[in-house]
Amino acid sequence: MKKYPLKAATPHSYVYSVRNLPEVTVEQRERALNATHWNEFAFPAGMLTVDMLSDSGTTAMTDLQWSALMLGDEAYGRNNGYYVLLDAFRDIFERGGEKNWKNAIDLIRTGCKDVDKLMDELYLCEYEGGLFNGGAAQMERPNAFIIQQGRAAESVLMEIVKKILAERHPGKVFTIPSNGHFDTTEGNIKQMGSIPRNLYNKELLYEVPEGGRYEKNPFKGNMDLEKLEELILAVGPENVPLVFSCITNNPVCGQAVSMANIKATSEIAHKYNIPYVLDTARWAENAYFIKMNEEGYEDKSIAEIATEMFSYGDAFTMSAKKDGHANMGGMLAFRDKGLFWKNFSDFDEEGNCTFDVGVKIKVKQISCYGNDSYGGMSGRDMMALAVGLKESCNFNYLDERIAQCNYLAEGFYNAGVKGVILPAGGHGVYIDMTQFFDGKRGHDKFAGQGFSMELLRRYGIRTSELGDYSMEYDLKTPEQQAEVCNVVRFAINRSQLTQQHLDYVIEAVSELYKDRENIPNMRIVSGRTLPMRHFHAFLEPYANED
């Protein structure tokens, strides 16, 4: 095959739809900030220049996704999207690579009218023993639950686990460790009365090599295995109902988690008979990092790596609004007759299952979100997601996405901004606010939130504070406080932003860094103790006098 290499990267896509932005003045943004009580989630998106609040559901979908969306049907029971979506999950997370994919959606795309073929290859296929039962097995032992987004999947999981534990051990308090619980996961764990713990290597996270570049990704998102086993032994395995890993590790600056660490965490959890749960919102980005940086995976496809990652988990939650490359969707699943099922189902003395935990989850799904055919999603969104999951297996797409993250992070670093977390994560860039402010702002100042609000006020750039304010530093125990990363995240929306957007952000942050002494602190006016307070608390800025 002939090649004529260039220094410039080869384009792999076109942009066919454009949204124009209004000209918004600083005074107009100030008025809106005051009206919305300085809550970044309440600020009107239509007044922003660059929105980097979240990469969740903000994806610019592909032409194949939009065409699939038009094939969706809205039948209340067992619409086509139900079958197609579950089989897309099987393709990627169970079948070991593209060569083994069934691509069930092609039956719908081609307008198949052969009813026997549809029954044999789509509607009535039996699957059991994995993460996505099908046919009669899914009705008898439901283990895969379509839900409209990740936090809803977490909520269903935690509510059912809480109910079962409360019935078995009234009044008992449990601990649930992770390499890093995100804000919604932590909030759901707290609301079930349990204690979340984040076990990672904080010292490694803040290390930056000379010049800011790593030859290989150091997998800073890894679970600290020593801390995990120490915690399990300290509180007792019987008091740890679940062990989590977040891949990539969103609260720890979107850092990658190695396959070796996923496997080792699974082994430790299983050593103590504890189910291992994966938070897999950014599974494809994590698979990319493994492919590019971990020995033995360089020749494997993203889908092959994903299958192995998921093989180590007993259950998983997923916000498919991230690496589902879609605007809506989620999933909760556990391994058929696996450890999660065994630990949370009821059995008689002879070992026969008397009540299946999957049935309990299904009842919750139906009562809160919709029947198991759609779980709160529209049929057309399910079709778009089925395609989007496979779009995320495209290496060229992932390579360009990670390159955008690296460009932004290196742009900050080269501009002299302190506190940039390197290497960049897979979905955005994080700046440590303690270093940014030269260690001069106390935890009670919520200066990271002040930075986020000032960036919005001056330049129309919305980011997400994920530090002292959002992670509720002031409400935590000293042990938990030590596990908080005091950071602000610049999330990069999938397939949406151009280099012009990133250059604008780099210049704005560079200018704000030079004037950091004049960035205000923030105080919480109301909602300090509300669960996940950053979504609904009222704040106000005040001048920094230190």
Regions picked out by a protein language model, each given a short descriptive name:
Residues 373-453, 457-484, 520-530:
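Conserved small-domain helix->loop->beta segment predominantly found in fold-type I
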Residues 167-168, 392, 458, 470-546:
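PLP-dependent enzyme catalytic core of the Aspartate aminotransferase-like
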Residues 63-71:
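A short, surface-exposed helix-loop junction/capping segment
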Residues 2-37, 53-55, 65, 77-84, ...:
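Conserved PLP-enzyme active-site core in the AAT-like
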Residues 248, 438-447, 495-504:
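Short, conserved charged micro-motifs
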Residues 334, 431-434, 492-494:
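Short beta-strand-to-loop capping motifs
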Residues 42-63, 75-87, 473-476:
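A structural motif shared across PLP-dependent enzymes of the aminotransferase-like
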Residues 328, 369, 427, 485-493:
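Short amphipathic alpha-helical segments
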